[in-house]
Every structure is written in structure tokens, then in C-alpha cells.
Design a protein with these regions (language model features):
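Membrane-interface alpha helices of multi-pass inner-membrane proteins
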Residues: 25-29, 168-170, 174-182, 196, ...
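Catalytic lumenal/periplasmic loop and adjoining terminal transmembrane helix
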Residues: 284, 397-547
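Short acidic/glycine- and proline-prone juxtamembrane loop motifs at membrane-interface regions
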Residues: 35-37, 180-190, 369
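Start-transfer (signal-anchor) and selected internal transmembrane alpha helices
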Residues: 1-28, 134, 263-274
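Signature aromatic-anchored transmembrane alpha helix within multi-pass, membrane-resident enzymes
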Residues: 15-21, 272, 347-355, 381, ...
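Transmembrane-helix motifs of polytopic, lipid-linked glycan transferases
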Residues: 102-107, 111-112, 135-163
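Extracytosolic helix-loop segments that constitute the early lumenal/periplasmic catalytic or substrate-binding loops
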Residues: 23-26, 41-70, 74, 81-93, ...
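Transmembrane-lumen/periplasm boundary regions of multi-pass, lipid-linked membrane glycan transferases
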Residues: 188, 224-367, 420-425
Length: 548
């Protein structure tokens, strides 16, 4: 029995669980390849980096639809260049080997993505549709997020033991939001990959290292400072408690504290100034504005003590993060993190930093789940410490054994809820992208001028109908219109129940509308995801008559 337990302990490592997490990220990319309105800017900007030269800025999407607040192009520029390089490499690999050619042309393997891929001839390349580029783009971002999370778990394993690292990895795997959003081009995810890496630097020095511990502290401060300057200014709420902790609680005397304050403040200011200058230089050109710093614009837009224009997009109660957002995002890790804070001294600083972030963010009336991504690894670390404590106590009493079993049952239930409810609902929440793909499947006929004119309404544009979903080779034939003037358009994808006389519905696209309890015997699954027609594909009846 002991040999079996040791063998099992050796085989189950956080590396293995992190591998499953990465595979889950890729699975979500495959079954939900589209992006929504929150990801719109980075998605469209990355598309334009790939398909338009820098001297063609007037053709870029942000020129026509600038959005509410300017965002930085630094992320899309890097991601777009990496996507082009990887796409070219995949073309070489796939087309140089007959086995890989057959694999990547197999519709059974591609499943739900097959309608995005035209039948490929032997001489044609693999990366043919724009949607392929979007999938590759998301794979790259998913790799970056997974690597940072793996680094964080590796540091936990090194300093707190393999069991704690496995628990942290298992909790991340059981949560829906981390894996589903890890590959999505949100500014929050660009920031998440960097802040998680910074937190691993901060956590790594809890045990003696050959390198000076203050160096890792300073590096962590520098990475978060870069995030503040470029991607998410709200991470100042993470930078502040992190800086206070490394300055006040990791010093030996007043002299050491003074040196650390000077070093960390200088590093923070230097990085913020350097990357703010970089952002201003690049973004001012792309936005065609003088001295534009996007994150300063975002800060001015969201500042609760200033104009705070974000409240026009909806507000929630002060405690909403605590009673709604965190329970949904963390699931079983939410109570376990509190248990870990109470019973495990080593994780208390992490819990306090994460709690300060959530508490400070609660003062902003406009609240969203994605705002909390930077501190999810910290809460999971605290929850993993709590599970480890339960594991140590399980043989000491019946109560300890019961709580340990209850915790693992919670992990299993969390997995079931994540996949059976959250994932199923979210996958069905991109009717705009599905409608655009369905339109291309119909092989629309050209009009007298040799064009196909499609109008995309706001709802479809916000639920997946991005530039990546548009035709690759027929981009001069199909004219996509997202403006209000649509009297010359023959095709429409929209959520309207009725259209003017002369239009015909040719395809209905279903989407997520809600969840409900299953009241029919045998009551399985207990929670049902409801779908209904969300978007319709219309075309003029004249076209139908001409084709007949």
C-alpha cells in the first residue's frame, strides 16, 4: 500500500495537472474560436497587424470604429507578428509532410471548425482562412498564460512542497474562467500573463536562495509597473500592496528598509516612465493623436474620484465581488482560501494582498469578473494551502477526514459545474460569429456590380463577427458593412424579429439565453442550459428568385 501511494505521489505532479490545463485551454479555443465585444479592440488590431501594413492605417478597424477609450497597440503588434511567424512555420511543417497534410485536412479532427475551412487542394497551404490566424493568435496567448501559471505553480512546489502545487494546479483546472479566458485577447489577459509571472518572482524568495532576495522583489515590482504603464493601469492596486509588503516585511532593520524603498521606487518610476514613453510613441502614431497615453485615458475614464464615466455601462453593489464574482470564479477555492488564511500562516500575506486588491476595486461602481484575474492565482495558492492542511489533519479526527473528503468532493463538483454549465453556456454565446460563418457557407451570389453586400448589426459585431471571420481570398468581392446606412445591402445578419417586406430568413442561429433547474425525471443533468434563436441570416427575395 505504501509503495502504491509513493508511486501515485510520484506520478501526480503539478506539471501533469498543468498539462491538462493547457489542453483544456486549447480545447476551448477549438470549440469557441470567436471573440466578443470586450476583446474586440485587440482582436481587430491583431488582424490589422497581420493583414495590413503600418502605412495602411486608414484601413485599420480602429479608424472606422475607435471605441470608447483608446487602447494600446503594443500587445496586438507583438501578438500579430508572432502569429504571422507561427502561421508561416505551420505552413512549412504541414505541407512538407504527407502525413500532417492528411491530418490537418481531416474534417473529423477539426469538428466544429470544418465550416471555417474550405476544401484544400494538394498544392494549397494549410493556413488559408483568416479564422485559422485567429486560432493561432489565441493559441499563442494561451501558451503565455499557461506558462506564467505553470511558473507560479512550480515556485509553489519548490517552496511549499509538491502537494500544495498539485492542489493549486487542480483548483485552477477545476475553475472555468481561468482556462476559458486564458487565450482571449483581453487587456486583462495580457496583464495576467505578466502579473502571474511577477507573483512567482515575489513568492519564490520565501525560502533561502543564492541570489539576493531583494533582486527578485525589485524584478517583480518592475514587471507589475510595466503592466500598469501599458496594459492595465488598475494593477496599481496590486503594485501598491506588493511594494509595501516587500519593503516593510522583508527587511532586517531600518537601514535595509531605506535601501529597499529607494531601490523599488526608482525601479518602479524608471519602468513606468520608459514604457509610458514607448506607449506614447507608438500609440500616438497609430491613433493619429498627439501625445496619447492610452492607460492615462483609461484611468481618467474609470477614476472613481474623477469623472468616472464607466458607471454609464452599469454599476453593481459594493460587495458584489465578494458575494457574486469570487464565488463563481473560484468555486470551491473560495471557502478553501479562507480556511487556508485561518490555519496556514505562510499564505496570509498572499491572501491579504489579494483581498486588498478586491476591496480597493470595489469602490469602482462598474464591476466585471475579468477585473479580478490578477489575484486569482493568489487565492488559489491560499486554497491549496488550506487543502494541504486538511490533508494533514484527515487522520487526526473524524471531522478532519470528513472535511478533507468534502474538499475533494467540492473540486469534483467545481469541474462538473465549470464544464457542464459555464462552458456549455459560454460556447453558445457567440451567435454573431456563427452567423457570419453560416453566411459564407451559403456561397452567396454576386449582384449586378459583381459584389456581395452584407450588413452586420451591432449585436453580431459584439458576439463574434470580427474581421477574422471575413473572407480571405474574396475580400474585394464581399463588402461588409457595419454602419447604419444599409439600404444597398442584400444580405443581413442581425437579431431582428422582422425585416422590411422582400427579405427572407435563410438561416437561424441559436445561442445561450439562460439556465434553469431540470424538473423532469430523472432530473439529470440538474441544471439545463437554455438556447433559442438569437441571430438570423436574411437575404433579399429578389436574390432567391434570380437563383431559381
Amino acid at each position: 500500500m505504501r509503495v502504491r501511494k509513493r508511486l501515485l505521489h510520484t506520478l501526480i505532479s503539478h506539471e501533469l495537472v498543468d498539462l491538462f490545463f493547457f489542453l483544456l485551454v486549447l480545447a476551448y479555443v477549438r470549440v469557441a474560436p470567436y471573440t466578443k465585444v470586450e476583446e474586440s479592440f485587440n482582436t481587430q488590431a491583431t488582424h490589422d497587424v497581420i493583414f495590413h501594413a503600418n502605412d495602411e492605417l486608414n484601413a485599420w478597424d480602429h479608424k472606422e470604429f475607435p471605441g470608447v477609450v483608446p487602447r494600446t497597440f503594443l500587445g496586438p503588434l507583438v501578438l500579430g507578428k508572432m502569429t504571422k511567424i507561427l502561421a508561416r512555420a505551420m505552413e512549412v511543417v504541414v505541407n512538407s509532410n504527407p502525413v500532417t497534410k492528411r491530418v490537418f485536412r481531416n474534417e473529423k479532427i477539426w469538428g466544429e471548425l470544418k465550416h471555417l475551412v474550405e476544401t484544400l487542394n494538394e498544392e494549397e497551404t494549410f493556413v488559408r482562412t483568416k479564422m485559422h490566424y485567429q486560432v493561432i493568435m489565441r493559441m499563442i496567448l494561451g501558451c503565455a498564460s499557461t506558462f506564467s501559471l505553470h511558473k507560479f505553480h512550480a515556485v509553489i512546489g519548490k517552496n511549499f512542497g509538491n502537494d500544495v502545487a498539485v492542489y493549486a494546479s487542480a483548483l485552477a483546472l477545476a475553475q472555468f474562467h481561468l482556462a476559458f479566458y486564458a487565450s482571449r485577447p483581453l487587456p486583462n489577459i495580457f496583464a495576467f500573463a505578466l502579473t502571474t509571472f511577477a507573483l512567482s518572482l515575489w513568492l519564490e524568495e520565501r525560502r533561502g536562495l543564492k541570489i539576493n532576495s531583494s533582486v527578485l522583489d525589485t524584478l517583480a515590482i518592475m514587471v507589475v509597473s510595466m503592466v500598469v504603464a501599458v496594459f492595465r493601469c488598475d494593477n496599481i492596486l496590486l503594485l501598491a500592496p506588493l511594494g509595501i509588503h516587500v519593503t516593510l516585511f522583508r527587511v532586517t532593520d531600518i537601514y535595509d528598509a531605506s535601501l529597499r524603498i529607494i531601490a523599488n521606487v526608482m525601479a518602479m518610476v524608471t519602468v513606468i516612465v520608459a514604457f509610458a514613453y514607448t506607449s506614447i510613441t507608438i500609440d500616438s502614431r497609430h491613433w493619429d493623436q498627439e501625445y496619447l497615453w492610452p492607460e492615462w485615458e483609461v484611468l481618467s475614464f474609470n477614476n472613481p474620484m474623477g469623472a468616472n464615466r464607466s458607471h454609464h455601462y452599469g454599476t453593481k453593489p459594493f460587495l458584489w465581488y465578494w458575494y457574486s464574482a469570487l464565488p463563481r470564479m473560484l468555486l470551491i477555492a473560495y471557502p478553501l482560501s479562507m480556511y487556508g488564511f485561518k490555519h496556514e500562516r505562510r499564505c496570509r500575506s498572499a491572501f491579504m494582498i489579494a483581498s486588498f486588491f478586491v476591496f480597493a476595486y470595489s469602490f469602482l461602481g462598474h464591476k466585471e469578473l475579468r477585473f479580478l484575474f490578477p489575484v486569482l492565482p493568489l487565492f488559489n495558492f491560499c486554497a491549496a494551502c488550506g487543502m494541504h492542511r486538511l490533508n494533514l489533519n484527515r487522520k487526526k479526527s473524524i471531522k478532519g477526514n470528513f472535511l478533507h473528503a468534502l474538499a475533494w468532493m467540492g473540486v469534483i463538483v467545481s469541474c462538473a459545474v465549470s464544464i457542464g454549465v459555464f462552458a456549455k453556456a459560454s460556447i453558445a454565446n457567440y451567435p454573431g460569429g456563427e452567423a457570419l460563418a453560416a453566411f459564407h457557407e451559403l456561397n452567396p451570389e454576386r449582384d449586378a456590380s459583381g459584389h456581395v453586400r452584407l450588413h452586420i448589426d451591432d449585436h453580431c459585431a459584439q458576439t463574434g463577427a470580427s474581421r477574422f471571420g471575413q473572407a480571405y481570398h474574396d475580400h474585394n468581392v464581399i463588402l461588409y458593412n457595419k454602419r447604419q446606412d444599409h439600404e444597398h445591402d442584400d444580405w443581413f445578419i442581425n437579431e431582428y424579429e422582422k425585416m422590411p417586406k422582400g427579405y427572407e430568413i435563410v438561416r437561424n442561429i441559436t445561442g445561450f439565453i439562460g439556465v434553469k433547474l431540470n424538473k423532469k425525471f430523472p432530473f439529470w443533468p440538474p441544471i439545463l442550459v437554455e438556447k433559442d434563436v438569437r441571430v438570423k441570416v436574411w437575404r433579399k427575395r429578389r436574390i432567391l428568385e434570380d437563383e431559381q
